[in-house]
Every structure is written in C-alpha cells, then in structure tokens.
Amino acid sequence: MNRVYVKKEFCISCHLCEVYCRLQHSASNELLKAYKKEYPHPLPAVRVEERGNLALSVRCQHCDEPLCLYACLGGAISCDNDSGMVNYDPEKCIGCWSCILACPFGAIKQDKEQKRIFKCDLCIGEETPACVANCPNEALVYIDIQDNDINNPDSHHKQTNNIKGGV
C-alpha cells in the first residue's frame, strides 16, 4: 500500500503540487486550458497548509479506518481492501458533506459547482502521483507504508495534526 508523505524540511510552499494535481485531473492535460478554459474547472485534490516556517502538502491519507466512509450517507465512499485506497464514486454523492466534516485531516474538498466532493485518488493508473513526480525539492515521496514506520513522530499524519493545531 503506497502513500504520499511529506518531508517537511524540504517543502518550500511552492504550491506546484496543487498545480500538477489540477493538471493531472484536467480533460486537456494542458496547463493554460486547465486553468482558464475547461468547464467544469479541474480542482486540485491537494492543498498546501502553511503555519509560520512550516508548510505541508495535505491530501487524503487513505486511512485504514476511514471516518469519511462511515459518515457517507450516499454510499459514495468505499475502501478497496486489496490496495487500501479510499475510493469515491461521484455518481453516488448526494452532496451532504458529511465526509468533509468527518475527515480529521481536512483532506476532502467541496466542489460547489458540481455539488459534490473531490479527494486525492493518488492519480490512479499512474505509476507515481503527479504531485510527487513534479515536486522540485523532492519534499513529497510515494512510499510503501508496509516498509516504513508511519508511527514515527515525523509521519505525515502527525505533521498534519500539528499544522492544523491538533496534538
């Protein structure tokens, strides 16, 4: 099960992860068209949170026990037990936003134009997510969580809680 993690000491808050996420999920795959001409506008499923000198790229963590899944009233969120991916079916979304409220990382976003949510899909079908492949400082890494200690104090989960003001 691969996940995206942030090496906080290398993130310079350039927001290119947001740009490449938007581009990857655009119909045209062209930067200018994705930002100016496509409708509905492609939205990035990642965002950069900044607090003082700390910056982190925040996205869906594809949790082992996804609170968004349990909160989803329309059955739009599911978990693939083989890959560990938390998936989303926009056709089933009823726009109740319960998943947004349930996510402890604030990683699920509201698409007000389409009246549904959007979240990181790890650029399904690609070898490496666009945010990771295009990070100029290699602050984002795509690693197998089975081979790494995610309970380490520098893990992305704890980093995200700290930047959001948690414990």
Task: Write out the residue ranges for each language-model feature.
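Conserved beta-strand segments that form the floor/walls of ligand-binding pockets within enzyme
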Residues: 5-6, 87, 102
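Aromatic-flanked redox-active Cys/Sec active sites in thiol-based oxidoreductases
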Residues: 8, 74, 90
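N-terminal beta-strand motif that seeds the catalytic metal site of vicinal oxygen chelate
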Residues: 1-9
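N-terminal signal-anchor transmembrane alpha helix
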Residues: 12, 18-25
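A generic structural signal for beta-strand entry/edge sites
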Residues: 3, 83-85, 117
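A short local structural element in Rossmann-fold oxidoreductases
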Residues: 22, 73, 104
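Ordered, amphipathic secondary-structure segments that act as subunit-interaction surfaces
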Residues: 62-85
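Flanking helices and flexible, charged tails adjoining ferredoxin-like Fe-S electron-transfer domains
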Residues: 27-70, 90-167
